[in-house]
Amino acid sequence: QGCPRILKQCKQDSECPGECICMAHGFCTI
């Protein structure tokens, strides 16, 4: 399903929707 284009703050990958991962800047991205 990929990574939804939603700016979502995170501390770990499991907080991110779809296949997004939590990046160093603290937001979910592809």
Swiss-Prot record:
Keywords: Disulfide bond, Knottin, Protease inhibitor, Secreted, Serine protease inhibitor
Gene3D superfamilies found in the cross-reference section: 4.10.75.20
Pfam families: Squash (PF00299)
Residues the UniProt record annotates as site (Reactive bond): 5-6
GO molecular function: serine-type endopeptidase inhibitor activity
Subcellular locations according to the entry: Secreted
CDD domains per the UniProt record, alphabetical: PlantTI (cd00150)
InterPro entries, A to Z: Prot_inh_squash, Proteinase_amylase_inhib_sf
Gene Ontology terms: cellular component: extracellular region
Cysteines paired by S-S bonds: 3-20, 10-22, 16-28
Domain of life: Eukaryota
Domain notes: The presence of a 'disulfide through disulfide knot' structurally defines this protein as a knottin.
Its biological purpose: Inhibits trypsin; probably participates in a plant defense mechanism.
Family membership: Belongs to the protease inhibitor I7 (squash-type serine protease inhibitor) family.
Listed name of the protein: Trypsin inhibitor 4
Organism: Momordica charantia
